[in-house]
Amino acid sequence: MENRGIYYIDFGTQAQFIEEIEKMNSEYYFKNGKNKTYHIITYGCQMNVHDSEKLAGMLNAMGYVETQNLEEADLIIFNTCAVREHAESRVYGNIGPLKRLKDKKPELIIGVCGCMPQQLEVAQKLAKVFPFLDIIFGTKSLHKFPQLLYKAITTKKTVIDVAEDEDVVVEGIPTARREGVSAFVNIIYGCNNFCSYCIVPYVRGRERSRRPEEIIFEIQQLAANGVKEVTLLGQNVNSYGKDLPDGIPFYKLLEKVNAIEGIERIRFVTSHPKDLSDELIFAMRDLEKVCEHIHLPVQSGSTRILRQMNRHYTKEDYLRLVEKLKENIPDIAITTDIIVGFPGETEEDFEDTLDVVRKVEFDSAYTFIYSKRKGTKAAQMPNQVPDEVKHERFQRLVKLVEEIALKKNQQMLGKVCEILIDGYSKRNNLLEGRTRTNKVVNVKCSDEFMYKFVNVKILEASRHWLYGEVI
């Protein structure tokens, strides 16, 4: 018996729409001697990156071919993020100039999906401000993309689909992962925590876990296709299985993934501190494929502010967790998220945050200035912190975080570590890989090492990356 309100759907229901669009695109190819192309612009977290891989997989199945040139594309999709105002502003700024392209190419399909249009008022605003948009749909309608696209093509009208009540888990969506030997795998969707600053539960829905057998099957298929490293995704992976009848906890899922032949590294994001169990810490310690890295968002070091954020732990709780992690996994790298300028944050509260940063010595931190999100509890709170105070505190925090990150990376100098080379560096003529602790290492070596594990001696260190040579 399934949980009430959560529906398990097979993607096969979209087959007829995929077939119809593929037929249209085949006719286009025979008439014009070229394929129709698509271009996806992605904002936000790893969940969005993986959703874009699913969009690409569906488009490939419908006969489209990806292009890196937006101007040449026959279909453009913006996969959006709603966590911060800055991300939304970038989307509005990037859609506007496409009207010129749409006027030039009337058959061009332009769509907006993801977390922004999952908010009905935002979807309606997008349609009003940009009447040339063809498809607008939220996160809960991702699996219906072929159907929505077919409707937009055949009716020539803007299609809006924002499913507000239905929480679904859809299996079998085709996925076009980037080239390489690392892959993202969803294990749980949505969030039940309702942190007072966060829009995610409203745009991603309530927590709903994939069945363990579906996850294991997907990872087995990935391993059979040469994938060596998987990152298990969820807004809060520590909640995995709690909503399933006879579900297994997250640490048990890790044990199952650890047993899959061919998979050599396991990562996961994100972990909520309140749900980080001893069993999970012990699993990280004992399972040889689970990497020595955890992303554990602290958000604030002030117990008073954490209470206002609805985080359900104190400063002392967080520090005890970190101590336990370091006791059991001495080489663990800990990264985090920190918000500066939450409503009511005093200088004393901010000093508590700096104190946590000094005591934990995070390997890196994503630092954010508080961004008011409509519909969240924090947006209505009094004592909003003035912008100039937020920015001054932000600069102090970033300075401390980067000093510690540099110190931690310099401690790697002269050491030999294993990295999995998985692509080209942004620095010229270098390949790039990551250590088990998720540190980026640039290395000068031939392409024969691409997608392989190699031992590297660390020769240089900066705040954000290391440089080494193959030994």
From Swiss-Prot:
Location of the Radical SAM core domain: 177-407
Domain of life: Bacteria
Named cofactor requirement(s): [4Fe-4S] cluster
Binding site for [4Fe-4S] cluster 2: C191, C195, C198
SUPFAM superfamilies, sorted: Radical SAM enzymes
Recorded catalytic activity of this chain's protein: N(6)-dimethylallyladenosine(37) in tRNA + (sulfur carrier)-SH + AH2 + 2 S-adenosyl-L-methionine = 2-methylsulfanyl-N(6)-dimethylallyladenosine(37) in tRNA + (sulfur carrier)-H + 5'-deoxyadenosine + L-methionine + A + S-adenosyl-L-homocysteine + 2 H(+)
Start and end residues of each TRAM domain: 410-471
Alphabetic keyword roster: 4Fe-4S, Cytoplasm, Iron, Iron-sulfur, Metal-binding, S-adenosyl-L-methionine, Transferase, tRNA processing
CDD domains, per the entry: Radical_SAM
MTTase N-terminal domain: residues covered: 36-154
UniProt feature coiled coil, ranges: none
Main localization of the protein described in the UniProt heading: cytoplasm
Family: Belongs to the methylthiotransferase family. MiaB subfamily.
Quaternary structure, from the entry: Monomer.
Role noted for this protein: Catalyzes the methylthiolation of N6-(dimethylallyl)adenosine (i(6)A), leading to the formation of 2-methylthio-N6-(dimethylallyl)adenosine (ms(2)i(6)A) at position 37 in tRNAs that read codons beginning with uridine.
Protein name per its UniProtKB record: tRNA-2-methylthio-N(6)-dimethylallyladenosine synthase
Organism encoding this protein: Caldicellulosiruptor saccharolyticus (strain ATCC 43494 / DSM 8903 / Tp8T 6331)
Phylogenetic classification of the source organism: Bacteria, Bacillati, Bacillota, Bacillota incertae sedis, Caldicellulosiruptorales
